[in-house]
């Protein structure tokens, strides 16, 4: 057994450690040496995927020891998918936020210390195909190990087709991509777990800039003066109570210049006290997580650039803090948004839709025709769908089906919510502005918030809105995840983007 503290390792081959846990994934379930642990009988494909994911998250939660995983399939595509699913599940379960790494904090530490802040424990993972032994393959002929140190250190594995069956070649090559992805999910969770005094607007801007410089992504952070000049008054209004300047971060990853671009718009409320509609102590708990939309999509940009995804992406991240101060926005204030539409601020704690409306307009001004936004937006969706399921709103049926399929194939849950005109009617009541940011006393706050955002989507633009107040945060440690940010929707959105 390896010494404790040497870090998580993932490798191709058969585990040489006698006391390792042996697990086999077959077409009918998950087995060990003596019995069936999980049965897939009468389960849909989505349920099978979730069962695999949850089982390996439980193993990951234990964080120590070794596990030998045998994938019994002769389907190359399924072998690659299973490798990615299992590795990510193990890392998700193993993840912890390192308390010791926050000592002597300094500017730029969120990026510089992210590997020490992101702790995956000491689990040792071995993965191979079920035909390896039958083919007489010696695992020593091919061993690829991915240590969690830096995503740049994880490159495409070289395979030897003479020594390995085809499925095992796929597994070996898939390991590095899986570790790269799982590591970036860990980074996103770490960003979400950092409190506002350590990860404020300035620190988040610096983090985005560091990623951009590392991978050659075009970067610009619009600050107060530029935001005023542009007319991003909704973002500015939310941040008026803060002593920091607001920011609108734009990151452009363009491997194919001139081709279509997809926008990733992530809500980045670094802390949300509610403004003058001040939250209670109970409701204010965990409000550092109100930037998980920005954190998760920013890390998807890193995954895409590090992995060489051949799809043009534009990240748009509004960064603000909704606090109380002499200049904070008041109930009844009217603002003119970047789109030119005016909005009456009825509820200062309905701030997410304000920063997002300017950001959605900016994304479209940058030439994107498909926009995906991710936001911890409404308690209504949380109440309706619970802790595990994202609310999905979409203005295009075919696109919605693609997102639903990508989420299901990644083991994540979402549920399509209505985007009907009756919800739009609820934001048109203002006598002094084009729109109101809230519908007082009306049920259906999730669809109403989505209807508000839909007002800023131009004709011909495909739009997906994911409301993730529930699944963005694990509110107490359970058998699958430690307490804190979860990296929700990263697997599903990445899978969608990887499709041709």
Each language-model region and where it sits:
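Short amphipathic alpha-helical segment within the helicase RecA-like ATPase core
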Residues: 2-261, 265-268
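A generic structural signal for tightly packed, nonpolar segments enriched in small/aliphatic residues
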Residues: 8-34, 66, 137, 151, ...
């Amino acid at each position: 057994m390896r010494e404790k503290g040497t870090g998580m390792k993932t490798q191709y081959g058969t585990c040489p450690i006698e006391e390792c846990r042996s697990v086999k994934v077959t077409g009918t379930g998950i087995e060990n040496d003596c019995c069936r642990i999980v049965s897939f009988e009468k389960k849909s494909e989505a349920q099978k995927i979730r069962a695999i994911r949850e089982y390996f998250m439980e193993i990951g939660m234990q964080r120590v020891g070794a596990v030998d995983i045998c994938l019994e399939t002769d389907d190359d595509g399924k072998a690659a998918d299973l490798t990615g699913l299992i590795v990510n599940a193990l890392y998700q379960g193993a993840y912890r936020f390192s308390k010791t790494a926050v000592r002597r904090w300094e500017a730029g530490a969120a990026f510089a210390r992210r590997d020490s802040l992101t702790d995956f424990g000491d689990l040792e993972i071995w993965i191979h195909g079920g035909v390896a032994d039958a083919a007489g393959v010696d695992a020593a002929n091919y061993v690829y190990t991915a240590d969690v140190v830096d995503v740049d250190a994880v490159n495409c594995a070289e395979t030897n087709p003479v020594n390995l069956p085809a499925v095992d070649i796929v597994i070996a090559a898939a390991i590095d991509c899986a570790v790269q992805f799982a590591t970036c999910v860990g980074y996103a969770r770490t960003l979400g777990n950092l409190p506002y005094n350590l990860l404020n607007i300035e620190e988040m801007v610096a983090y985005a800039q560091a990623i951009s410089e590392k991978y050659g992504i075009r970067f610009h952070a619009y600050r107060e003066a530029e935001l005023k000049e542009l007319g991003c008054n909704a973002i500015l209004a939310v941040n008026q109570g803060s002593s920091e300047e607001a920011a609108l971060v734009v990151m452009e990853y363009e491997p194919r210049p001139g081709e279509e671009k997809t926008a990733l718009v992530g809500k980045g409320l670094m802390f949300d006290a509610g403004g003058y509609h001040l939250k209670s102590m109970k409701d204010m708990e965990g409000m550092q997580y109100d930037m998980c939309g920005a954190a998760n999509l920013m890390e998807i940009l890193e995954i895409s650039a590090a992995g060489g995804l051949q799809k043009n992406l534009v990240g748009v991240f509004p960064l603000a803090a909704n606090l109380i101060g002499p200049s904070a926005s008041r109930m009844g204030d009217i603002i003119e948004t970047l789109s030119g539409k005016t909005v009456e601020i009825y509820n200062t704690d309905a701030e997410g839709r304000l920063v997002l409306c300017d950001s959605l307009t900016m994304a479209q001004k940058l030439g994107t025709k498909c926009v995906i936004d991710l936001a911890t937006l409404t308690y209504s969706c949380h109440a309706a769908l619970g802790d595990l399921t994202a609310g999905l709103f979409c203005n295009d049926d075919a696109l919605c089906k693609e997102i639903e399929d990508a989420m299901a194939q990644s083991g994540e849950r979402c549920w399509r919510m209505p985007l009907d005109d009756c919800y739009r009617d609820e934001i048109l009541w203002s006598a002094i502005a084009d729109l109101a940011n809230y519908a007082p006393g009306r049920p259906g706050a999730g669809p109403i918030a989505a209807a508000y955002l839909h007002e800023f989507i131009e004709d011909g633009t495909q739009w997906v809105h994911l409301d993730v107040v529930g699944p963005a945060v694990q509110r107490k440690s359970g058998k699958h995840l430690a307490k804190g940010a979860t990296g929700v929707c990263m697997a599903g959105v990445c899978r969608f983007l990887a499709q041709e």
